[in-house]
């Protein structure tokens, strides 16, 4: 089968991502049971527009945002040209759905999702992923999130998750803090079926080495469309069980303060390192929608140190470092012994 996009590629991906936005919003409203999303449609002067949906002050979610955008233009931003110089001089099209959820309860993790598609002349690619940021560590929650996304990837090809999991660890990393933003998930970018799966620049990374071992997979446009469809569809099953398990856990003022402190790391990553934020600002995107990912409240504290042996300590030392969450028996034993397994 041809690797070229079908003639209706733009319409097809747009409809997939609109449906993803709808399904997630309906699911989250059912889960929250109190608040509803408000929608704001917007137009971009240079071409295109989108629909931003935000839920505030719910029973579970302090703030939840689910954005859809479909934008096009003539001049490509430098961030794209530097990665794919052959796209220069072509009109471009980009569509995506992104989501960030900030729950009130510190025992329910923040979660992020983004699936996107890009075309410019002969150049096209899919990108996407989902990642989880707990504030209090529970290994079973982490495992459920990874399991659902692993299964979604393996429906397309059994080797994809072997690269996308470590690529996520690599991408969502705060270099200035030397720690991960959370416990990862999956991440992929610039997927057009050509070459090796890993398109990053770090030849020392686990994702790069796994990609070398696997070789070329020869995926086509339809395979990659199915990947976005499967992974987007896996989100609610990966996250809803965590909410149901944690929503009635009582928390202290100190635990809420720690959640806000760790949210500060989320802000730092999104404003300093995130390519999506940079792309949006470089292409004159809608600032309110681009910065929707930021939490409504966060805090910073100079020189904070968690008490040794506390849950906050385990979060900082173990759950902000890449791990083999599914298979590491030593990690499992440690979590069980220290009441951070389930």
Swiss-Prot record:
Involved in the heme and chlorophyll biosynthesis. Catalyzes the aerobic oxidative decarboxylation of propionate groups of rings A and B of coproporphyrinogen-III to yield the vinyl groups in protoporphyrinogen-IX. Residues 266-301 are annotated as: Important for dimerization. This is Oxygen-dependent coproporphyrinogen-III oxidase. Keywords: Chlorophyll biosynthesis, Cytoplasm, Heme biosynthesis, Metal-binding, Oxidoreductase, Porphyrin biosynthesis. Substrate binds at residues 98, 114-116. The record marks 176 as: Important for dimerization. Its main location: cytoplasm. One of its GO terms (molecular function) is coproporphyrinogen oxidase activity. Homodimer. Belongs to the aerobic coproporphyrinogen-III oxidase family. It catalyses: coproporphyrinogen III + O2 + 2 H(+) = protoporphyrinogen IX + 2 CO2 + 2 H2O. Gene3D superfamilies: Coproporphyrinogen III oxidase, aerobic (3.40.1500.10). It is found in: Cytoplasm. Its cofactor is a divalent metal cation. The active site is at 112 (proton donor). Pathway: Porphyrin-containing compound metabolism; protoporphyrin-IX biosynthesis; protoporphyrinogen-IX from coproporphyrinogen-III (O2 route): step 1/1. Its EC number is 1.3.3.3. GO terms for cellular component: cytoplasm. Disulfide bonds: none annotated. A divalent metal cation binds at residues 102, 112, 146, 176. Pfam families: Coprogen_oxidas (PF01218). GO terms for biological process: chlorophyll biosynthetic process; protoporphyrinogen IX biosynthetic process. Signal peptide: none annotated.
């Amino acid at each position: 089968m041809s690797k070229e996009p079908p003639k209706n590629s733009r319409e097809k991906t747009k409809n997939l991502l609109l449906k993803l936005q709808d399904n997630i919003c309906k699911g989250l409203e059912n889960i929250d049971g109190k608040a509803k999303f408000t929608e704001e449609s917007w137009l971009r002067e240079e071409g295109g527009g989108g629909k931003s949906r935000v839920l505030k002050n719910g029973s579970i979610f302090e703030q939840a945002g689910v954005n859809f955008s479909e934008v096009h233009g003539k001049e490509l931003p430098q961030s794209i040209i530097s990665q794919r110089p052959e796209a220069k001089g072509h009109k471009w099209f980009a569509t995506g759905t992104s989501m960030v959820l900030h729950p009130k309860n510190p025992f329910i993790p923040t979660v992020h999702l983004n699936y996107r598609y890009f075309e410019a002349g002969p150049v096209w690619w899919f990108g996407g992923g989902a990642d989880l940021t707990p504030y209090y560590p529970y290994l079973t929650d982490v495992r459920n999130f990874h399991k659902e996304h692993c299964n979604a990837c393996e429906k397309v090809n059994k080797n994809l998750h072997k690269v996308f999991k470590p690529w996520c660890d690599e991408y969502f990393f705060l270099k200035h803090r030397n720690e991960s933003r959370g416990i990862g998930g999956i991440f992929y970018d610039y997927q057009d079926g050509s070459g090796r799966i890993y398109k990053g620049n770090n030849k020392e990374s686990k994702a790069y080495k796994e990609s070398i071992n696997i070789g070329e997979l020869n995926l086509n446009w339809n395979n990659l469309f199915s990947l976005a469809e499967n992974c987007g569809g896996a989100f609610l099953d990966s996250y809803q069980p965590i909410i149901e398990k944690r929503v009635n856990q009582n928390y202290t003022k100190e635990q809420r303060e720690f959640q806000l402190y760790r949210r500060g790391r989320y802000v730092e990553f999104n404003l300093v390192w995130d390519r999506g934020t940079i792309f949006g600002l470089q292409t004159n995107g809608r600032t309110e929608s681009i910065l929707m990912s930021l939490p409504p409240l966060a805090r910073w504290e100079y020189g904070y140190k968690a008490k040794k042996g506390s849950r906050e300590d385990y979060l900082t030392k173990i759950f902000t470092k890449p791990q083999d969450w599914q298979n590491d028996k030593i990690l499992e034993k440690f979590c069980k012994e220290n009441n951070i397994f389930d």
